[in-house]
Amino acid sequence: MQQRRPVRRALLSVSDKAGIVEFAQALSARGVELLSTGGTARLLAEKGLPVTEVSDYTGFPEMMDGRVKTLHPKVHGGILGRRGQDDTIMEEHQIQPIDMVVVNLYPFAQTVAREGCSLEDAVENIDIGGPTMVRSAAKNHKDVAIVVKSSDYDAIIKEIDANEGSLTLETRFDLAIKAFEHTAAYDSMIANYFGSMVPAYHGESKEAAGRFPRTLNLNFIKKQDMRYGENSHQQAAFYIEENVKEASVATATQVQGKALSYNNIADTDAALECVKEFAEPACVIVKHANPCGVAIGNSILDAYDRAYKTDPTSAFGGIIAFNRELDAETAQAIISRQFVEVIIAPSASEEALKITAAKQNVRVLTCGQWGERVPGLDFKRVNGGLLVQDRDLGMVGAEELRVVTKRQPSEQELRDALFCWKVAKFVKSNAIVYAKNNMTIGIGAGQMSRVYSAKIAGIKAADEGLEVKGSSMASDAFFPFRDGIDAAAAAGVTCVIQPGGSIRDDEVIAAADEHGIAMLFTDMRHFRH
């Protein structure tokens, strides 16, 4: 499917001008006639390039403050004209063929992201002529090349040189795919923005208008193909959002190790999002999307040592996340002690990377330091639909807790309660977390009965010889019966933090009082399914 088409005339009109001068120079040097508009034309002319303004080409001036520039039959006829089929009509109307269109669109996303952006500002950054040219060229890809990404400039010049001034149909088709993806994403952004403006137009509160749009348009870019999915018989790929504003596994840089698997990415996300909850040096070890050890310490080495002690068996082959730079001492401790799939941290020292390089299969990721958590949406696919909700960024402080028992917690119990409450948010429901001295000592995850999660947490602590007496316990949701409190008391727990809200709260509180346990209500649940 060679079907080469020579590139003799190109129309260039870009908002993002990165690389456009060099690209235009390369085209001009190869005998390509340049047409252009507005700021792009002025820039090319300033650089000494022979460029024809579209208004001169069409004989019709730009008008309405630039709203109408390229919407003209001589432009779109030149793009849409089918070579060998529409030649006569093109000659009759003095329409010259345009073989390449180089366009990227007004920066709508960047405009509406600016603080104080008005609806009028947004509207003026809705591109009309650009998408029209892009779609016209993509539709007629059998004859015309459409270029919407500056990252394609170099490859296009190389192919023109290799093919005596022409581009192949395969290349034009691939460029057309990118073009349609580009305009689809652009229209989605505009639709989503206008959907968010419904309250302003209808005089309603956001609650009355609805938090979520009537039609949900999502745009993700493929970052990589995976060897397989969650299981070896499933195919998979990793897609990421554009313009992510928060350090994440999606934006992280892999500095060492073999390619990440589907499960690696899911587990690394769980570990990183958990470790972000802590201001102090912290370590989170995750296995199968559940934390199996979490601790804060005087250093990340101290935090790692303590997190590992929670459950060394489960830590084998786990994912380790830190909220400080990975240093050589900590890297050496990990490599000497256990098999690890992934280590992720804001950064890694050169000395640390030399140590981890000795284990070629260890994947090391750096994600940069994070600031405030960014609100967003979470999605869960169901057969035939998609569940959408706000990200669970909720967290309570000591001042928001309610003591509902006769006994008040000690200062250490309170610190441990707040610590394990943060961890419980990232454990699959039903979630129970035991903690003492700012480290987890037992985690019960994913049980259908809350009391069994409590029992498992106690069993794990006992198996590792960790002292439960005087510890705090967090439950991600309320206790429906007193049995969970009885199990915790039998293990040695002396403080419980939970949301409250059960019809049997009085019974549960009475059980805590019987055992001399301090109980704190958060009035906030953290189910995780």
Curated annotation (Swiss-Prot):
The keyword Membrane belongs to this UniProt entry's keyword annotation: no
A single GO CC term for this protein reads:
cytosol
Q: Which InterPro entries match?
A: AICAR_Tfase_dup_dom_sf, Cytidine_deaminase-like, MGS-like_dom, MGS-like_dom_sf, PurH-like
Q: Which residues carry this modification: N6-acetyllysine?
A: 287
| Pathway annotation | Purine metabolism; IMP biosynthesis via de novo pathway; 5-formamido-1-(5-phospho-D-ribosyl)imidazole-4-carboxamide from 5-amino-1-(5-phospho-D-ribosyl)imidazole-4-carboxamide (10-formyl THF route): step 1/1; Purine metabolism; IMP biosynthesis via de novo pathway; IMP from 5-formamido-1-(5-phospho-D-ribosyl)imidazole-4-carboxamide: step 1/1
Q: Name one Pfam family in it.
A: MGS
Q: Which GO terms describe its biological process?
A: 'de novo' IMP biosynthetic process
**Segments forming domain MGS-like:** 1-148
Q: Which CDD domains match?
A: IMPCH
Q: Which UniProt keywords apply?
A: Acetylation, Hydrolase, Multifunctional enzyme, Purine biosynthesis, Transferase
- Domain of life of the organism in this record? Bacteria
From the UniProt record, which GO molecular function terms apply?
A: IMP cyclohydrolase activity; phosphoribosylaminoimidazolecarboxamide formyltransferase activity
Give the EC number.
Answer: 2.1.2.3, 3.5.4.10
| Reaction it catalyzes | (6R)-10-formyltetrahydrofolate + 5-amino-1-(5-phospho-beta-D-ribosyl)imidazole-4-carboxamide = 5-formamido-1-(5-phospho-D-ribosyl)imidazole-4-carboxamide + (6S)-5,6,7,8-tetrahydrofolate; IMP + H2O = 5-formamido-1-(5-phospho-D-ribosyl)imidazole-4-carboxamide
Q: What is known of its domains?
A: The IMP cyclohydrolase activity resides in the N-terminal region.
Query: What family does this belong to?
Result: Belongs to the PurH family.
Spell out the PANTHER family in the cross-references.
Answer: BIFUNCTIONAL PURINE BIOSYNTHESIS PROTEIN ATIC (PTHR11692:SF0), BIFUNCTIONAL PURINE BIOSYNTHESIS PROTEIN PURH (PTHR11692)
What is this protein's record name?
Bifunctional purine biosynthesis protein PurH
Taxonomy of origin reads: Bacteria, Pseudomonadati, Pseudomonadota, Gammaproteobacteria, Enterobacterales
